[in-house]
From Swiss-Prot:
GO terms for cellular component: plasma membrane. It is a peripheral membrane protein. InterPro entries: EF-4 (IPR006297), EFG_III/V (IPR035647), EFG_V-like (IPR000640), EFTu-like_2 (IPR004161), G_TR_CS (IPR031157), LepA_C_sf (IPR038363), LepA_CTD (IPR013842), LepA_IV (IPR035654). SUPFAM superfamilies: EF-G C-terminal domain-like (SSF54980), P-loop containing nucleoside triphosphate hydrolases (SSF52540). It catalyses: GTP + H2O = GDP + phosphate + H(+). CDD domains: EF4_II, EF4_III, LepA, lepA_C. This is Elongation factor 4. One of its GO terms (biological process) is positive regulation of translation. Belongs to the TRAFAC class translation factor GTPase superfamily. Classic translation factor GTPase family. LepA subfamily. The keyword Aminoacyl-tRNA synthetase does not apply.
């Protein structure tokens, strides 16, 4: 066991985690040169296209160190984006150490900090690595000082490497062997294995990635899942090198996969413990804290007969994505669908894209909302994540909105722009620290503002240099109201949104104008109104198409024309009573794209 090293790679987006993992695989000969592709571990098409890591992946490599021993390195490549921080904490639970990769040109960014603190809280040894030293703008000395200053770990002697050209990769491997401690565990104790991740394979059933803490898991043995008490047979066990490689057993300290033909989707939940069916361990390992979704949106299949497939797809996806939450929902405008809870907007985009690609579904999403705490006049507290569930205004005592603490790292020259943006988003500043050229500012912001388009706006006001990391801290009372859109006097539930009273006039007008462009003209007038309670705050009318009924009259008495026009008017009136307006797909999406 003393020759095993378990570690994960943490870094900010685009600091070169996936490229570094490619190099480690290549140096240790995990794949032949022919099989090497850039970003081997980003196996989803979506990951490659966007150039981001979404799912953590594990690999086992053998490294012949300079001290003459062969070490087994198990490493897990983790995502860097703030929406996927739960993936990072899951990966870290399986490790004894972490490589903190920092771009020698850009320096420390907010996400580097957040992930690094997560690792230090779990008592992992953090080894700093300065990447991209081949770039002309690299300043390893300055960045090393920045790491010591901001993160607070010793970094003057940090390894310098360039994952792209391969300089210094051997030194990184030597550092891992020297600085990261071997796993602690007892091979003779009863089996305890932590499920780090699982996914559904059409042929094999559920495949689980496990870290063996104590004991040995042999091929063909019976094991049980501790939370459900169900017993299964370990048909295949093995490791990823990144290819699957079957083994006869997995020993304490190792990371590998178990395939046991589990067909039901939630047979082996992530964070659960496996043990032997006979003479098993008494208590499970501490799992992961369940993450609470921050953003909710209604998602509906475009054709209603897809509903069953949609449900199956969500079940399969939630196995692989432990943070996904969903419950059935119906809407008078869109039919049957689900209310899905996400960790943030990027997560929402990725989930929708994965559903559409991997399961061939056509979906439509309503505007995302956060969870509000509503105090009723009778003293009850209810949590509302859907605007149409908001109780009537006269029953509400006050509404509390979720507040996040946002840590923003930004170069000095863009500080003014960032502060202006935060004030516009109703933020209050709580802290500001200068670290050399970087400034760390902390703001308390309403989550609803952060979720909509804050990240994009932050990047554009700072030319992409600012970085953001946020977490929920509390609920604060706020003057929130529900903005309804009425079409010919009928509420369209899928277009409702909860917003701050100061924004309603501006938001209402913009929405009504947008709807006017998108709803096709009918044979009768369509009134589009934005309302708060019973008060109408904006209105626009789509004029009716009309046929020129008097075209056949020429000359003669005006009363003949009047008669025809009045007859047309009567017809339009009747039509308006029975006619209903189809709201096109684009109208629902317009709500999402409505920038302030």
């Amino acid at each position: 066991m003393k020759h095993i090293r378990n570690f994960s790679i943490i870094a900010h987006i685009d600091h070169g985690k996936s490229t570094l993992s490619d190099r480690l695989i290549q140096v240790c000969g995990g794949l032949s040169d022919r099989e090497m592709a850039a970003q081997v571990l980003d196996s989803m098409d979506l990951e490659r296209e966007r150039g981001i890591t979404i799912k953590a992946q594990s690999v086992t490599l053998d490294y012949h160190a300079k001290d003459g021993n062969t070490y087994q390195l198990n490493f897990i490549d983790t995502p860097g984006h703030v929406d996927f921080s739960y993936e990072v904490s899951r990966s870290l639970a399986a490790c004894e150490g972490a490589l903190l990769v920092v771009d020698a040109g850009q320096g420390v960014e907010a996400q580097t900090l957040a992930n690094c603190y997560t690792a230090l809280e779990m008592n992992l040894d953090v080894v700093p690595v300065l990447n991209k030293i081949d770039l002309p703008q690299a300043e390893p000395e300055r960045v090393a000082l920045e790491i010591e200053d901001i993160v607070g770990i010793e970094a003057i002697n940090a390894v310098r490497c360039s994952a792209k050209t391969g300089i210094g990769v051997e030194d990184v491997l030597e550092e891992i062997v020297a600085k990261i401690p071997p796993p602690v565990g007892d091979e003779t104790a009863p089996l305890q294995a932590l499920i780090i991740d699982s996914w559904f394979d059409a042929y094999l059933g559920v495949v689980s990635l496990v870290r063996i803490k104590h004991g040995v898991l042999k091929k063909g043995e019976k094991f049980k899942v501790m939370s459900t008490g169900q017993n299964y047979n370990a048909d295949r066990v093995g490791i990823f090198t990144p290819k699957e490689k079957d083994k006869l057993e997995l020993r304490a300290g190792e990371v590998g996969y178990v395939i046991s033909g589990i067909k039901e989707i939630h047979g082996a939940p992530v964070g659960d413990t496996l043990t032997h069916a006979k003479h098993g361990a008494d208590k499970p390992l501490p799992g992961f804290k369940k993450v609470k979704p921050q953003v909710y949106a209604g998602v509906f299949p475009i054709s209603t007969d897809e509903y069953e497939n949609f449900r199956d797809a969500l079940n399969k996806l939630s196995l692989n994505d432990a943070s996904l939450f969903f419950e059935p929902e119906t809407s008078s405008a869109l039919g049957f669908g689900f209310r899905i809870g996400y960790l943030g907007l990027l997560h929402m985009e990725i989930v929708q894209e994965r559903l559409e690609r991997e399961y061939n579904l056509d979906l439509i999403t309503t505007a995302p909302t956060v969870v509000y705490e509503v105090v009723m006049t009778n003293g009850d507290i209810v949590y509302v994540d859907n605007p149409s569930d908001l109780p009537a205004l006269n029953n509400i005592d006050e509404i509390h909105e979720p507040i996040v603490e946002a840590n923003i790292l930004v170069p000095k020259e863009y500080l003014g722009n960032v502060i202006t943006l935060c004030i516009e988003k109703r933020g209050s500043q709580t802290n500001m620290v200068y670290h050399g050229n970087q400034v760390a500012v902390t703001y308390h912001l309403p989550m609803a503002e952060v979720v909509m388009d804050f990240f994009d706006r932050l990047k554009s006001t700072s030319r992409g240099y600012a970085s953001l990391e946020y977490n929920f801290i509390r609920f604060d009372p706020a003057d929130m109201v529900r903005l309804d859109i009425l079409i010919n006097g009928d509420r369209v539930d899928a277009l409702a949104m909860i917003i701050h009273r100061s924004n309603i006039r501006h938001r209402g007008l913009a929405l009504v104008e947008k709807m006017k462009e998108l709803i096709p003209r009918q044979m009768f007038d369509i009134a589009i109104q934005a309302a708060v309670g019973s008060q109408i705050i904006a209105r626009s009318t789509i004029k009716a198409l009309r046929k020129d009924v008097t075209a056949k009259c020429y000359g003669g008495d005006v009363s003949r024309k009047k008669k025809l026009l009045n007859k047309q008017k009567e017809g339009k009136k009747r039509m308006k009573q029975v006619g209903n307006v189809e709201v096109p797909q684009e109208a629902f999406l317009a709500v999402l794209k409505l920038n302030d």
